[in-house]
Amino acid sequence: MALSTFKREHIKKNLRNDEYDLVIIGGGITGAGIALDASERGMKVALVEMQDFAQGTSSRSTKLVHGGLRYLKQFQIGVVAETGKERAIVYENGPHVTTPEWMLLPMHKGGTFGKFSTSIGLGMYDRLAGVKKSERKKMLSKKETLAKEPLVKKEGLKGGGYYVEYRTDDARLTIEVMKRAAEKGAEIINYTKSEHFTYDKNQQVNGVKVIDKLTNENYTIKAKKVVNAAGPWVDDVRSGDYARNNKKLRLTKGVHVVIDQSKFPLGQAVYFDTEKDGRMIFAIPREGKAYVGTTDTFYDNIKSSPLTTQEDRDYLIDAINYMFPSVNVTDEDIESTWAGIRPLIYEEGKDPSEISRKDEIWEGKSGLLTIAGGKLTGYRHMAQDIVDLVSKRLKKDYGLTFSPCNTKGLAISGGDVGGSKNFDAFVEQKVDVAKGFGIDEDVARRLASKYGSNVDELFNIAQTSQYHDSKLPLEIYVELVYSIQQEMVYKPNDFLVRRSGKMYFNIKDVLDYKDSIIDIMADMLDYSPAQIEAYTEEVEQAIKEAQHGNNQPAVKE
């Protein structure tokens, strides 16, 4: 129960009383990766997140661990090479949250990609990204392209490229990395905001003053080094330090829409260019839905709640109907949406899509380290870079030595399945185990595929008598209880949006079962009547934002 909601008080007691080699501010994928790398090396690590884990950018991506084909278009060769190699590592270390997905790249007359350039581009991509033989690109004729996805626009179609991307659940990837870090000894807590830094007599950062957002308690965490990994909030965090540099972020917003496959029967993931501005976007089938995105527009409004506007929805509907003209989707067909912010490093005079996705480490005179920019795919390598630097500083300043990075072959939580090649066999073996408990085969397969080597704990929850009084389907009940016991879920939206993904990919379950879920959480976590009211309102607000176009200007008025 290393990351249990029931251990919050125990974790807070340790955070108050101990001194840490490293305190990390930010509980997205970057912070999680740093916590895992540092704790695996033997550092004493603490991590604080002001909202829920992955609530910022790390639950709002296109949900691909991809090699970045579009960066080849911009001649960012190094980015392609590194992300391609990292992608393979991310998959191997957690095949339960990442899965290979063949991607179709249709080529139309006058489109971004011609046959020759696509063949050369994908070939270069294979070589740079170190793509394994079975996943190397294929070039398809017009007939073969339509056989893969008959909905693709036939007019002007010349053929297609076929290559592999990796689909992931970004929020679950984050929580699995976080859980493994906690197993390695990291003290990790959500709903805890860093307010100020503390300094020693030499004006070096030596701690963080925090506030528990659930109880309003204030306390100080003592640290030898502090890393700011706050994503879109890194500038806000740095503003509390006297020694910041002149670098800054430029935020852009990306939006996705979700449509049921009864309306948009997409059978094949497609990467295509839009008619309006030539931007490349994805259409990806998942769990009986198709999701499409993303947009890329400058954003300077409330960081904690970027919203999908009607303009965003219209843009993506137009893009779908342009590339898949027979489906005729309308705004009413959108079941759910999400919007996320990319924390990019400011480059003067560049359009949103032109700004590099590279990451940088900034070191202030105060000793505060900030990691900015970067991509989901590169989280492990980014962590390695900054923890190498932390290790160097701890040796120089304190004479401490730690082992080198060891995350390349380190499975994340749930990833102990005998490697990616064995994953399918592992799942079937767990399905057989579940049959002995009387658990439905399809439910067992979904749970084993999603939770990997942690699935036995969910099967055990299924044996408890409380389930029968819960008014919930077994699958939802065991996921909910597990997420409270093992994944620090405190509010209903933590579960509905981030641990289960239902707010995006099965909003009907949210509408049908939200009241029962809140009842169970109120009972398990001893909510007050005021909390029940507040959290119910938060769920209703999240549903509204997901289902409708919102009137949110790009710049705060």
From Swiss-Prot:
InterPro entries assigned to the protein according to its UniProt record, in alphabetical order: DAO_C (IPR031656), DAO_C_sf (IPR038299), FAD-dep_OxRdtase (IPR006076), FAD/NAD-bd_sf (IPR036188), G3P_DH_FAD-dep (IPR000447)
Reactions the enzyme catalyzes: a quinone + sn-glycerol 3-phosphate = dihydroxyacetone phosphate + a quinol
Keywords from the named record: Cytoplasm, FAD, Flavoprotein, Glycerol metabolism, Oxidoreductase
One Gene Ontology cellular component annotation held by this UniProt entry: cytoplasm
Protein's GO biological process: glycerol catabolic process; glycerol-3-phosphate catabolic process
Molecular functions per Gene Ontology: glycerol-3-phosphate dehydrogenase (quinone) activity
Annotated protein name in UniProt: Aerobic glycerol-3-phosphate dehydrogenase
Organism: Staphylococcus aureus (strain bovine RF122 / ET3-1)
